[in-house]
C-alpha cells in the first residue's frame, strides 16, 4: 500500500517550513486564474478575517478557513513537485508578495513582524530566519519563459513594468490595488488581515511517495471536485512515458505546439480543444478495434484501460499530431491534400445539423 503524509497546516506553517521547496512541473496546466477568481478569493478571505465586518468577532484560537488540498511528491532533485493545487498556491504567493510590498516599508512593530513572517513564506531562510532573496520557495516550469520570468521577478522584487501583461502580473496588480483600498477603508485593521490569512487559513498538504501515487490522488480529487480536463490527465501519462525514455523536452515542446494547433481548429461546446482531439481519436481507435456498440463510454474511461496502455507508445502521440494536422487541412481547405471533389463534400458536411460526421 502506498504511503501518504497528510497533515493539515496553516499557510504560514506550510510555506515557512525549512524543507519547503515547491516546483510546478512543466506537464501542469498554465496558470489560469484571472480577476474573477482573485476577487472571489479576496472576498472570501475578508469575510473570514472580519466576520460581519467586525475585526473583534474573529477568534484567532479557533477560527479556520479551509483553502483546499495541495498534492505533491518529492522528485529526484528533492523538490516538492505540485500535482494538484498549483493555481491556489501560486495565487497565495502573489497575494503574500503584494502584502509584503506594502507592509515591508512600515516601521511599527506589528508590520515588522508581519513582514518577517511573509519573508519566511516566500524565500528560503538561514538558521536565524533571515531570507535569501535570491532563493524562492517556489519555481514554475509550466509557463512560457516570459511568463515564468514575470512570475519569478514579481516574487523576487515586488515590482512590475507596464509591458508585463501575464496573468501573474495582472493578478498581482489586482491584489496591490485591493490592499491599498483596504488600508484606506480600514486603517485600524491593517495588521490583522495578512496575519489571519497566514495563521488561520488552512491547506491540506498530501505528500505521496511517488509520482504515480500523486497522479492517482490528483485524478480522484478532481473527479470529485472541480474537474481538470481529460487531456490534462492524458498529458501526465504521456509525460511519464517520454520522461522514462529520455525524451521529456521533445515531448513538452510537441505538446505545446499541439495545444496551439488544436486551439485554432476546435471550438467544442464542452471540454477543451485538446479533449476534442482525444475524442476524435477515440472513435478512430474504436473503429480500428472493431467496436460497433452505439454506446460510447466516457473519454477518460476509454483511455485508462489497461493502465493507460494506449498512451504509453510513440505511435499514439504521433497519430494525434497527424489527426490534428488532418483537421487543420480540412479547416483551411488544403488543395494540396484534397481534390476539388473532396473539398466540395467537406463543404456540404460543414452544414450538417450536428457534428457527428467528424467522428
List each model region and its residues.
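Generic detection of long, well-ordered alpha-helical segments
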Residues: 1, 31-42, 86-89, 165, ...
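Short alpha-helix boundary/capping and kink motifs at helix termini
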Residues: 1-83, 93, 191, 200-204
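Short, flexible loop/turn elements at secondary-structure junctions
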Residues: 28-31, 37, 45, 49, ...
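Short regulatory "switch" loops immediately downstream of catalytic or recognition motifs
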Residues: 46-54, 100-104, 179, 241-243
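Flexible phosphate/Mg2+-sensing switch loops adjacent to catalytic phosphate-binding sites
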Residues: 56-57, 63, 103-136
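Short active-site loop/helix that positions an aromatic residue
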Residues: 88-105
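Polyanionic (Asp/Glu-rich) segments that form extended negatively charged tracts
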Residues: 135-359
Amino acid at each position: 500500500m502506498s504511503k501518504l503524509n497528510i497533515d493539515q497546516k496553516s499557510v504560514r506553517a506550510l510555506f515557512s517550513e525549512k524543507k519547503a521547496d515547491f516546483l510546478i512541473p512543466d506537464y501542469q496546466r498554465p496558470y489560469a486564474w484571472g480577476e474573477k477568481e482573485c476577487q472571489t478569493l479576496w472576498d472570501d478571505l475578508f469575510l473570514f478575517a472580519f466576520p460581519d465586518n467586525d475585526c473583534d468577532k474573529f477568534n484567532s484560537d479557533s477560527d479556520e478557513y479551509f483553502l483546499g488540498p495541495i498534492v505533491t511528491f518529492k522528485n529526484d532533485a528533492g523538490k516538492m513537485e505540485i500535482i494538484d493545487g498549483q493555481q491556489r498556491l501560486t495565487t497565495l504567493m502573489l497575494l503574500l508578495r503584494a502584502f509584503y510590498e506594502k507592509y515591508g516599508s512600515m516601521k511599527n512593530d506589528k508590520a515588522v513582524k508581519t513582514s518577517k513572517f511573509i519573508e519566511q513564506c516566500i524565500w528560503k531562510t538561514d538558521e536565524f530566519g533571515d531570507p535569501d532573496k535570491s532563493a524562492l520557495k517556489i519555481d514554475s516550469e509550466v509557463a512560457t519563459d516570459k511568463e515564468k520570468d514575470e512570475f519569478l521577478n514579481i516574487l523576487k522584487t515586488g515590482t512590475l513594468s507596464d509591458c508585463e501583461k501575464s496573468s501573474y502580473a495582472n493578478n498581482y496588480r489586482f491584489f496591490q490595488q485591493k490592499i491599498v483600498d483596504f488600508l484606506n477603508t480600514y486603517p485600524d485593521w491593517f495588521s490583522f488581515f495578512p496575519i489571519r490569512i497566514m495563521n488561520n487559513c488552512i491547506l491540506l498538504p498530501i505528500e505521496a511517495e511517488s509520482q504515480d501515487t500523486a497522479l492517482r490522488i490528483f485524478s480522484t480529487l478532481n473527479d470529485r471536485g472541480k474537474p481538470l480536463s481529460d487531456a490534462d490527465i492524458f498529458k501526465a501519462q504521456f509525460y511519464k512515458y517520454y520522461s522514462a525514455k529520455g525524451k521529456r523536452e521533445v515531448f513538452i515542446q510537441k505538446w505545446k505546439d499541439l495545444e496551439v494547433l488544436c486551439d485554432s481548429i476546435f471550438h467544442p461546446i464542452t471540454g477543451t480543444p485538446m479533449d476534442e482531439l482525444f475524442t476524435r481519436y477515440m472513435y478512430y481507435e474504436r473503429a480500428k478495434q472493431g467496436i460497433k456498440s452505439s454506446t460510447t463510454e466516457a473519454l477518460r474511461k476509454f483511455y485508462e484501460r489497461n493502465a493507460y496502455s494506449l498512451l504509453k507508445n510513440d505511435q499514439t502521440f504521433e497519430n494525434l499530431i497527424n489527426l490534428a494536422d488532418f483537421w487543420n487541412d480540412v479547416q483551411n481547405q488544403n488543395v494540396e491534400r484534397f481534390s476539388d471533389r473532396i473539398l466540395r463534400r467537406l463543404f456540404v458536411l460543414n452544414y450538417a445539423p450536428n457534428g457527428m460526421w467528424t467522428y
